[in-house]
């Protein structure tokens, strides 16, 4: 019986050595004794229980190693955080960050102010046109030539007589040209007109100072020659059917208008024909003015007569406006009004028309016009 137990114990011992050796245990003398004692219980159950116990011991022995690895990982993370903190601390100072932020804010505002797409298209087209215009500029040598020419012109202008003198010359030319248009002798008019045209062209060309002085003296001589020519009407008067008419540019009452005409050897207009009426009515309505004529009923209410004492002919009554004369509020003086005549108060200030006979010119007759004024003086203040 004892012989059979011994081989079995040896087998158990070998098996335990293999299993325990696989989990990292060394055989000891005590261990062998423990195996021998356990041989008295259910051998398989005891062997499994011990195997589980050995596995637990192995796992427990590995826990410190895992903890050590976790600690190493934490240390690595901490080191990385430390390095990041150092890197952040080395960033630009706060003022630099603020500057960048402000710049970004300005850029954002600028982008917000960009024009809408249609406006951008318009700007683009304008830039294209400008680019084309720049491309058409003359070459540098041409620009230099233009600049030199401008410099010469500027120097020439600096040598011109004062502006008031130029203005005086220009006004003289304008007056002479207008006067020539009223001259009776066509051949003489043509000659003087050509002279004036040439002189005007010369003045417009503005030659050197000595030439201007020569032209100015010639103008004075021409003016004197023109004034010696026979003219039917004075300056600023209008010729019509053998008479001269002056249309005033200021206003007076009816009585002062008579005086103004007498001062220049004329009278407040007296109308003698339908043609004359149409001519004067046209002059008045064209300027849209209320204008005195030499007609009133001051001597006898309702009896109209001219300033030369002649009565108003019945055929002329057709020229009164509808419902006129109505003598509302002592309206005793006649005026041109709209397309006809009207009676109004004689103390009102209105424009007026003077009339006198035109001068007679025959053959080569020349006479010096009267030096007395031919234009009525303005009314006293």
From Swiss-Prot:
Lineage: superkingdom: Eukaryota
Swiss-Prot/TrEMBL Sequence repeat ranges: 96-118, 119-141, 142-164, 165-187, 188-210, 211-234
Annotated region described as 6 X approximate tandem repeats, given as residue ranges: 96-303
Tissues/organs with expression: Expressed in lymph nodes.
Gene Ontology MF, one: metal ion binding
UniProt cross-references to Pfam families, sorted A to Z: Lectin_C
Motif (Endocytosis signal): 14-15, 16-18, 31-34
Domain C-type lectin: 240-355
Keyword Membrane tagged: yes
Chain coiled-coil ranges: none
Keywords (A to Z) from UniProt: Adaptive immunity, Calcium, Cell adhesion, Disulfide bond, Endocytosis, Glycoprotein, Immunity, Innate immunity, Lectin, Mannose-binding, Membrane, Metal-binding, Receptor, Repeat, Signal-anchor, Transmembrane, Transmembrane helix
Major location category of this protein: membrane
Membrane protein topology class: Single-pass type II membrane protein
Keyword Transmembrane listed: yes
Miscellaneous note of the record: In vitro, is a receptor for SIV and transmits virus to permissive T-cells.
Quaternary structure and interacting proteins, as annotated: Homotetramer. Interacts with C1QBP; the interaction is indicative for a C1q:C1QBP:CD209 signaling complex. Interacts with ICAM2 and ICAM3 by binding to mannose-like carbohydrates. Interacts (via C-type lectin domain) with CEACAM1 (via Lewis X moieties); this interaction is regulated by the glycosylation pattern of CEACAM1 on cell types and regulates contact between dendritic cells and neutrophils.
Protein name: CD209 antigen
Organism: Chlorocebus aethiops
Classification lineage: Eukaryota, Metazoa, Chordata, Craniata, Vertebrata
Gene it is expressed from: CD209
């Amino acid at each position: 019986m004892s012989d059979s137990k011994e081989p079995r114990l040896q087998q158990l011992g070998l098996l335990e050595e293999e299993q325990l050796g696989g989990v990292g245990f060394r055989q000891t003398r005590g261990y062998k004794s423990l195996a021998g004692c356990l041989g008295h219980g259910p051998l398989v159950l005891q062997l499994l229980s011990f195997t589980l116990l050995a596995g637990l011991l192995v796992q427990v022995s590995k826990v410190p190693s895992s903890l050590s690895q976790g600690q190493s990982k934490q240390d690595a993370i901490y080191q990385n955080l430390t390095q990041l903190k150092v890197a952040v601390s080395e960033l630009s100072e706060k003022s630099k960050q603020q500057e960048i932020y402000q710049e970004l804010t300005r850029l954002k505002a600028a982008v917000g102010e960009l024009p809408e797409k249609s406006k951008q298209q318009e700007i683009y087209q304008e830039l294209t046109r400008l680019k084309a215009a720049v491309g058409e500029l003359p070459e540098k040598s041409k620009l230099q030539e233009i600049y030199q020419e401008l410099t010469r012109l500027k120097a020439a202008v600096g040598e011109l007589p004062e502006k008031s003198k130029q203005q005086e010359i220009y006004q003289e030319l304008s007056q002479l040209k207008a006067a020539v248009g009223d001259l009776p002798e066509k051949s003489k008019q043509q000659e003087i007109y050509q002279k004036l045209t040439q002189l005007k062209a010369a003045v417009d060309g503005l030659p050197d100072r000595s030439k201007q002085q020569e032209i100015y003296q010639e103008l004075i001589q021409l003016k004197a020659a023109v004034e010696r020519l026979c003219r039917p009407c004075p300056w600023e008067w209008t010729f019509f059917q053998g008479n001269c008419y002056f249309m005033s540019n200021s206003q007076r009452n009816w009585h002062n208008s008579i005086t103004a005409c007498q001062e220049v050897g004329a009278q407040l207009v007296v109308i003698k024909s339908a043609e004359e009426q149409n001519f004067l009515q046209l002059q008045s309505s064209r300027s849209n003015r209320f204008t005195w004529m030499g007609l009133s009923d001051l001597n006898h209410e309702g009896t109209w007569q001219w300033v030369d004492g002649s009565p108003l002919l019945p055929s002329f009554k057709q020229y009164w406006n509808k419902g006129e004369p109505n003598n509302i509020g002592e309206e005793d003086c006649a005026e041109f009004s709209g397309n006809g005549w009207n009676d109004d108060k004689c103390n009102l200030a209105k424009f007026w028309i003077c009339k006198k006979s035109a001068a007679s010119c025959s053959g080569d007759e020349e006479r010096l016009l009267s030096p007395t004024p031919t234009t009525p003086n303005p009314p006293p203040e």
